[in-house]
Amino acid sequence: MRIGYGFDIHAFGSIKPLIIGGVQIPYNKGLIAHSNGDLLIHSLIDALLGATAMGDIGTFFPSEDKKYKNINSRILLKYIWKRIYLKNYRISNIDITIITETPKILSYIFLMRSNIASDLNIKIEKISVKSTSSKMIGCIGRKEGIACQSLVMLVKSKNTDRKNNII
């Protein structure tokens, strides 16, 4: 059993659409980022990489590399998961917390969970996505940005049959 933790935070200020968990959220500001700024996916990638001691998102996708400019972060997630999956790791569960004052995202959580389940080819029941506020404290409380934390538990599979990876 392996546990990984990921964290990401981005400031508002971009004209890009606001994307969280692969879902475009109607809002008047996007997040400043090299990629599409999907901080949920970024924190999840870091959690997966941490659980397997493979480094971090910047190791695989450096912000200096122009080929990752505005890239859909779900593509990056699928790439990382394939590498981890081929090492016979399977996801036991994922627990994600988004910290934001605004926008309110409760109505988008099921879509986020669905996107993650699809990208990782796992059952949606293995994925928890929650939202909380910072109680008006700090940069998030001042509505300057959004943060996200992800926890992942992986198990090593004894089954090398890769035909059915939904566990």
Curated annotation (Swiss-Prot):
Cofactor(s) for this UniProt protein:
a divalent metal cation
Q: Which residues bind a divalent metal cation?
A: D8, H10, H42
What Enzyme Commission number(s) does the record list for this chain?
4.6.1.12
Gene Ontology molecular function: any one: metal ion binding
- Residues annotated as binding 4-CDP-2-C-methyl-D-erythritol 2-phosphate are D8, I9, H10, H34, S35, D56, I57, G58, R142
Its GO biological process annotations read: isopentenyl diphosphate biosynthetic process, methylerythritol 4-phosphate pathway; terpenoid biosynthetic process
InterPro entries recorded:
MECDP_synthase (IPR003526), MECDP_synthase_CS (IPR020555), MECDP_synthase_sf (IPR036571)
Catalytic activity reported: 4-CDP-2-C-methyl-D-erythritol 2-phosphate = 2-C-methyl-D-erythritol 2,4-cyclic diphosphate + CMP
Pathway(s) where this gene product acts: Isoprenoid biosynthesis; isopentenyl diphosphate biosynthesis via DXP pathway; isopentenyl diphosphate from 1-deoxy-D-xylulose 5-phosphate: step 4/6
HAMAP family named in the record: IspF
Q: Which family does it belong to?
A: Belongs to the IspF family.
Could you describe the subunit structure of this protein?
A: Homotrimer.
Q: What does this protein do?
A: Involved in the biosynthesis of isopentenyl diphosphate (IPP) and dimethylallyl diphosphate (DMAPP), two major building blocks of isoprenoid compounds. Catalyzes the conversion of 4-diphosphocytidyl-2-C-methyl-D-erythritol 2-phosphate (CDP-ME2P) to 2-C-methyl-D-erythritol 2,4-cyclodiphosphate (ME-CPP) with a corresponding release of cytidine 5-monophosphate (CMP).
The name under which this protein is listed is 2-C-methyl-D-erythritol 2,4-cyclodiphosphate synthase
The source organism is: Buchnera aphidicola subsp. Schizaphis graminum (strain Sg)
- Upper classification of the organism: Bacteria, Pseudomonadati, Pseudomonadota, Gammaproteobacteria, Enterobacterales
Report the gene name.
Answer: ispF
